[in-house]
């Protein structure tokens, strides 16, 4: 048994032919570069790529397996060097039961399963090549299909104001759109942590996941999970979600919710926090506010005490957020310590200070221990570390 880090929500920006998959994703976010980044620079051993339904992604994986670059694992997933790729698909549900669009993650055990799932999807999506497409099928039928194929069904960034389960998807309960028995886990999203979500009793049965939702290489690993498993593959991941046979989620590492883009209710135009009772922004006069995750959770919360034991949640500040850590400094740190995970979790302050200025080393250690002062984000603008 061993401990591994897992980030299970990574997009592909472009295929090997240059075709767009996630239109808002970086052009450098290709399959090859993602796997190199995760394996050699980030230290992520289990990586969920959630655009694997796209035909050109499937083709690239097939060719990589044929050439020996990639290797299919008996337990499910595809191995590249020290990283296992989990085959995932992000889909948008907006059926008659929904109050708004909902994004979900689906994972399949093998490439053959994902290819079969992609064929099934092709009759239900307008463009099978693109990411996060609306599926013209009910959420319940999608859940049934995933379960029948031995896959995993995980609602994504469930409190984010746009395109999520509790953002706009349901009025108050997940049972409005889903069969609760066919949900394997829920992904919290960047503006929420375990303490916040644990006050919603309908989530008690489900493990929490913290993932990056990376749209660029640098964002891989900004949120991740620590798992205790026998090996990095689909079967072991599924066991860890269920807490079976000693497999488990040890910890969730995520942004302090204050750093998220939607923590507090704020003006969409300028990011100014909303003032209770005001209908227009005090700063710019616009009347467009995005409800913050913290306010939405106050509406949904129905238990004061946390009743389900949960893995510890570690407020993690990505190195890119730390003042003084630009691209060149980040490269120096990775060359000295190997991966970002090693810098964030293992490097002693005195060792860091041999590579970067002592002030920067001290900030990295403070970021690791959650001792930095933060300014809350909202309205689509990230929070910041206060000077």
Swiss-Prot record:
<dbReference type="Pfam" id="PF14520">
    <property type="entry name" value="HHH_5"/>
</dbReference>
<dbReference type="InterPro" id="IPR010994">
    <property type="entry name" value="RuvA_2-like"/>
</dbReference>
<dbReference type="InterPro" id="IPR016195">
    <property type="entry name" value="Pol/histidinol_Pase-like"/>
</dbReference>
<comment type="similarity">
    <text>To M.jannaschii MJ0043 N-terminal region.</text>
</comment>
<dbReference type="Pfam" id="PF13263">
    <property type="entry name" value="PHP_C"/>
</dbReference>
<protein>
    <recommendedName>
        <fullName>Uncharacterized protein YqxK</fullName>
    </recommendedName>
</protein>
<dbReference type="InterPro" id="IPR005287">
    <property type="entry name" value="CHP00375"/>
</dbReference>
